[in-house]
Amino acid sequence: MPLLDSFTVDHTRMNAPAVRVAKTMKSPSGDTITVFDLRFCAPNKDILSERGIHTLEHLYAGFMRNHLNGDNVEIIDISPMGCRTGFYMSLIGSPKEADVAEAWLASMNDVLTVASQSEIPELNEYQCGTFNMHSLEQAQGIARSIIASGISVNKNDELKLSEKILKGL
C-alpha cells in the first residue's frame, strides 16, 4: 500500500494549534489545489471531543469560507481528521499560512457568537448523519482554547520522518 503524505511527518514534533501545508498539486486544468492540516491539538496528547468537533464541522466550514474565500481562493472542503486532532482543508489556490491562520482565528471568534444550538447549520436528521451528537458548549470551549493559544505554522521539512525511521516502522 502506498504511504500517504500525512504519514511521512513526525506527529510527535507537531505544534498545535498550527497550520501546515499538507499537499499542493495541480488539477488537470492547471488550477493549484492546496490541502492544509489545521491541527487543533497535539497528536497523541489531546483530542477534540466528538460532540465538539462535530459541531465545529458544521460551523467552521461556513465561517472559514467567509474569511478566506476570495478572487484567488475557493475552499472545496473542510473535514475533521479521523484522529480528532484537527481538520483537513482542501482549496483551490495557494494562500499563505498566515492568511489561513488569520481566517481560522476569525472563525473561532465567529463560533463564540453563536447564541444557541438552534443556530447550528444543517442540524437536522435530513442534513446530518448524527444530528443528535452536537455540543455548542464544547465547540465554543475549543474555540476559546484556540484563541487563547494562538496559531503557529508547522513546516514539513522540520517534521519529515527520516527514511531510517520509516523503514523501521
Swiss-Prot record:
Q: Which SUPFAM superfamilies match?
A: LuxS/MPP-like metallohydrolase
EC number(s)? 4.4.1.21
Q: Give me the comment on cofactor binding.
A: Binds 1 Fe cation per subunit.
Name the cofactor(s) required for activity, per the record.
Answer: Fe cation
Q: Which InterPro entries match?
A: LuxS_sf, Metalloenz_LuxS/M16, S-ribosylhomocysteinase
Q: Which GO terms describe its biological process?
A: quorum sensing
List the catalytic activities from the record. Answer: S-(5-deoxy-D-ribos-5-yl)-L-homocysteine = (S)-4,5-dihydroxypentane-2,3-dione + L-homocysteine
Detail which positions bind Fe cation: H54, H58, C128
Question: Could you tell me what this protein does?
Answer: Involved in the synthesis of autoinducer 2 (AI-2) which is secreted by bacteria and is used to communicate both the cell density and the metabolic potential of the environment. The regulation of gene expression in response to changes in cell density is called quorum sensing. Catalyzes the transformation of S-ribosylhomocysteine (RHC) to homocysteine (HC) and 4,5-dihydroxy-2,3-pentadione (DPD).
Family to which the UniProt record says this protein belongs: Belongs to the LuxS family.
Quaternary structure note: Homodimer.
Mind telling me what this protein is named?
S-ribosylhomocysteine lyase
**Per the UniProt entry, what species is this protein from, by scientific name?**
Shewanella woodyi (strain ATCC 51908 / MS32)
Gene responsible for this protein: luxS
